[in-house]
Regions:
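Exported/periplasmic ABC-transporter solute-binding proteins
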Residues: 2-149
Length: 149
């Protein structure tokens, strides 16, 4: 149905750094006074894999049970990493962008219809609409990426 990628935010009003390359992302994370990431699968990836791929020691704090963006908005952390769809709705932060694709971790969302569904035709119609070109602007506005069929 859609792919979800990891992005980075800073507090609203802070300078918006460039993270278009691995080197730029590494510099931003290295120079940040504090880094936050979620306790979800994307945060585990950041903690266990991203820093290694960037060739730097792990840095930051895993935030449990609350959106990372909220902690950045309050000023508790300078930068935050989480899935884009979870960062975009947070007020008080500036979305910097997605991390570079070669160090990215993508979560793919898929859907299916159970064999014993009470309304399989309606479910099929809904899924077909959600995957249609007409629905993609809305999907993308939430921070998710369309999947080619």
């Amino acid at each position: 149905m859609a792919d979800s990628r990891i992005g980075l935010v800073v507090k609203e009003g802070a300078a918006k750094p460039s993270i278009n390359t691995d080197a730029e992302l590494k510099a931003v994370l290295s120079q940040a006074k504090s880094v936050a990431y979620s306790d979800s699968a994307s945060g585990v990836y950041v903690e266990k894999e991203l820093f290694k791929k960037l060739g730097m020691p792990a840095k930051g704090t895993m935030i449990e049970r609350v959106p990372v963006g909220e902690q950045v908005a309050k000023g508790d952390y300078e930068v935050g990493l989480q899935q884009v769809a979870e960062l975009l709705p947070v007020k008080g932060v500036t979305f910097v962008g997605k991390i570079p694709e070669d160090v990215q971790s993508v979560t793919r969302f898929a859907a299916g219809i159970p064999v014993n569904a009470k309304h399989p035709e309606q479910a099929k119609a809904l899924l077909q609409f959600m995957a249609s070109p007409e629905a993609q602007p809305e999907v993308q506005s939430t921070g998710l990426d369309s999947v080619s069929r």
